[in-house]
């Protein structure tokens, strides 16, 4: 089916959607280059931001309840053979995806001075894929909706994302599934992946199902990726206690452990009778662990407790992790600046309130949904339909810990079997020569445990998390190049995926300025990449020069060969152009003898001159060139000598070429 012009579609539907140009963001205030502290009002990154409707249009031309979702779109720095789009969700429920954009997988971070700084090459997920950060459900982050009209269920939230995407592909038709249907999947269209963390473990499977089940899916969904997600209450509730023991914070003989173990037992008994996502008795487990770790620090005015997002850290009570990461306060200040809001096209009329990380009203409305089953029940059908699923977990998290996420994967039944089998054991995963974690794949499902990472994997392990998502999406950055092609990476016994190494295959190290340095050369990866680019240009130029020289050589040889052939032809028939045959009478007199019996050589020479057109074979080459291209009238005059017969001479104009 041919694609309609987006304006025609909008006209037919009566939807007032702005042109894509109106969403363009030319720059962000105080976005600094890595090597400079000067304000960067413009930058090489292609970026768009703004609002699109989340609910159907009503009679007044506005969406129901005035629901609009805010989005931030970052384009890829390097484009693979098949383009990719990652749609990013944060959790909560009700937490803004600016967490992901500015602290985890986006292109910049806070610089500690109130501005922004670009992340190091290879750390942002938009290196090889476009990323769409989405504030959803309506009311989250910069999104807005009428008061008391918040989204109240997971299916509703999913439908609103699908409605948003239907409008999105009208503004940006290159992302539409219609492109792939029209022109084929090889190189045409865009592969779409849903990704996020925490409570997004509920959002994402529901949204994936809504896309797949849509009568006309707006995008071509290929996979979903959930980090430290809450997806399976039966597998995950209670693993908080196991994590406390695994991390050597408690022992099984401690009083705290025994107390919480009783709560875990009561929780599991409740889970056996319920199919709800959140159960009060089970929520008591984490609350009790937090209370048990809360202490008054000597010399401090308040209390501290465990950071539920990173067990290696503590936080002030009652935040217990809500103040983390440490750049969060600066992010609040930045996103509340009027110049930043203006640059991002924030609607001051409908969203006048200051940005907050998590909207409590949105969260409360979503928690009223007690009928939607846990999202884990949607995964088997998605997997069987061909949608790839990645479950990954930072191993230092407590609230949605790696033990629970891995157990959820192992308990899952799909493709005619349960969990992983012995034929596909977990493999060690290495990035930049360091053990990054474990990797296991079976029947479209992949589980990755990330060593040394917290609840927000991208905060602690940006290079590793990016390598993970690139592998999952099947991008071959050996062909695309870019910074990640410089970082050795492998799973199991496969060869390292790396384009350039130094010092006999050494791995990149971290320099004083934070840049990765190639051993054996002392150069940063950026310097090595620049040298590689120049070498590529040099090699391409050398190849072109060789081709040119070969062509000139062949041309010269052909020219000389042609000239030699012309000389040979002239030696045979002369320059007269046409050879007049001698008469039999003339030939009969061609050989006479003198009275003493000797042959008359003078007569022979005279006869030879007549046969070759009146000139000797020793004529120089220049005369050949003088006439070979000349065209003119026939000259029938007799110029062969006093006694010679008339011959036809070559056509010429009398002028030289």
Curated annotation (Swiss-Prot):
Gene Ontology CC: membrane; trans-Golgi network
Glycosylation sites: 432, 444
Active-site annotation: 198, 397, 455
Membrane topology: Single-pass type I membrane protein
EC number: 3.4.16.6
Residue ranges, annotated region (Disordered): 584-657
Record bears the keyword Protease: yes
Key word Cell inner membrane present: no
Compositionally biased region (Polar residues): 584-597
Keyword list, A-Z: Apoptosis, Carboxypeptidase, Glycoprotein, Golgi apparatus, Hydrolase, Membrane, Protease, Signal, Transmembrane, Transmembrane helix
Molecular function terms, GO-annotated: serine-type carboxypeptidase activity
Cell compartments where the protein resides: Golgi apparatus, trans-Golgi network membrane
Positions with biased composition (Basic and acidic residues): 603-618
Spans within the Cytoplasmic topological domain: 561-657
Membrane-spanning intervals of the chain: 540-560
Similarity section: Belongs to the peptidase S10 family.
Function: Protease with a carboxypeptidase B-like function involved in the C-terminal processing of the lysine and arginine residues from protein precursors. Promotes cell fusion and is involved in the programmed cell death.
Name the record gives this protein: Pheromone-processing carboxypeptidase KEX1
Source organism of this protein record: Mycosarcoma maydis (Corn smut fungus)
Taxonomic lineage of the native organism: Eukaryota, Fungi, Dikarya, Basidiomycota, Ustilaginomycotina
GN (gene name): KEX1
């Amino acid at each position: 089916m041919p694609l309609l012009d987006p304006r025609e579609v909008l006209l037919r539907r009566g939807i007032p959607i702005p042109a894509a140009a109106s969403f363009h963001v030319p720059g962000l205030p105080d976005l600094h280059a890595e090597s400079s502290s000067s304000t960067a009002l413009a930058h090489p990154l292609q970026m768009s931001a703004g609002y699109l409707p989340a609910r159907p249009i009503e009679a007044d031309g506005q969406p129901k309840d005035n629901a609009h979702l805010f989005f931030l779109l970052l384009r890829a720095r390097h484009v693979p053979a098949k383009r990719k789009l990652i749609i990013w969700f944060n959790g909560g429920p009700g937490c803004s995806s600016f967490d992901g954009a500015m602290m985890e997988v986006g292109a910049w971070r806070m610089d500690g001075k109130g501005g922004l700084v670009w992340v190091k090459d290879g750390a942002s997920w938009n290196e090889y894929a476009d990323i769409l950060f989405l504030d959803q459900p309506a009311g989250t982050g910069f999104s807005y909706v009428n008061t008391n009209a918040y989204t109240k269920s997971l299916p509703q939230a999913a439908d609103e994302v699908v409605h948003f995407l239907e409008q999105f592909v009208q503004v940006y038709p290159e992302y539409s599934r219609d492109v792939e249907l029209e022109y084929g999947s090889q190189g045409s269209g865009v592969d779409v992946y849903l990704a996020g963390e925490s409570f997004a473990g509920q959002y994402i499977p529901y949204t994936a199902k809504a896309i797949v089940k849509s009568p006309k899916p707006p995008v071509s969904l290929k996979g979903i990726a959930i980090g430290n997600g809450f997806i399976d209450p039966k597998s995950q509730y209670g693993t908080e206690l196991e994590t406390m023991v695994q991390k050597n914070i408690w022992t099984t003989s401690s009083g705290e452990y025994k107390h919480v173990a009783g709560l875990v037992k009561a929780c599991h008994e409740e889970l056996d009778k319920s199919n709800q996502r959140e159960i009060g008795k089970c929520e008591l487990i984490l609350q009790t662990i937090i209370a048990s770790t809360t202490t008054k620090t000597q010399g401090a005015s308040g209390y501290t407790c465990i950071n539920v997002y990173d067990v290696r850290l503590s936080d002030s009570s009652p935040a217990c992790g809500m103040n983390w990461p440490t750049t969060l306060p600066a992010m609040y200040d930045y996103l509340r600046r009027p110049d930043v809001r203006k640059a991002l096209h924030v609607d001051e009329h409908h969203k006048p309130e200051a940005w907050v990380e998590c909207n409590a009203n949105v969260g409360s409305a979503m928690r009223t949904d007690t009928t939607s089953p846990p999202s884990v029940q949607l995964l088997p059908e998605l997997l069987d339909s061909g949608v790839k699923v990645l479950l990954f977990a930072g191993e230092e998290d407590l609230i949605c810990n790696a033990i629970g996420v891995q157990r959820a994967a192992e308990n899952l039944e799909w493709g005619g079997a349960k969990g992983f089998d012995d034929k596909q054991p977990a493999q060690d995963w290495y990035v930049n020569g360091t053990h990054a974690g474990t990797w296991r794949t079976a029947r479209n499902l992949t589980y990755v445990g990330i060593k040394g990472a917290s609840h927000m994997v991208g905060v602690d392990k940006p290079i590793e998390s990016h390598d993970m998502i690139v592998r999952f999406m099947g991008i071959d950055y050996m062909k695309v190049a870019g910074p990640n092609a410089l970082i050795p990476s492998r799973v199991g016994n496969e060869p390292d995926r790396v384009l350039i190494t130094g010092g006999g295959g050494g791995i990149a190290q971290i320099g004083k300025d934070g840049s990765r340095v190639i051993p054996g050369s002392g150069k940063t990866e950026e310097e090595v990449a620049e040298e590689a680019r120049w070498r590529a240009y040099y090699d391409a130029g050398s190849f072109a020069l060789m081709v040119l020289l070969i062509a000139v050589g062949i041309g010269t040889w052909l020219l000389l060969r042609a000239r030699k052939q012309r000389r040979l032809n002239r030696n045979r028939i002369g320059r007269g152009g046409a050879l007049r045959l001698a008469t039999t009478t003339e030939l009969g007199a061609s050989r006479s003898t003198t009275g003493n019996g000797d042959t008359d050589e003078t007569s022979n020479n005279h006869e030879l001159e007549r046969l070759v057109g009146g000139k000797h074979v020793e004529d120089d080459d220049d005369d050949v060139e003088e006439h070979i291209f000349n065209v003119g009238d026939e000259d029938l005059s007799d110029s062969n000598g006093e006694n010679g017969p008339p011959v036809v001479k070559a056509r010429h104009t009398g002028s030289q070429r």
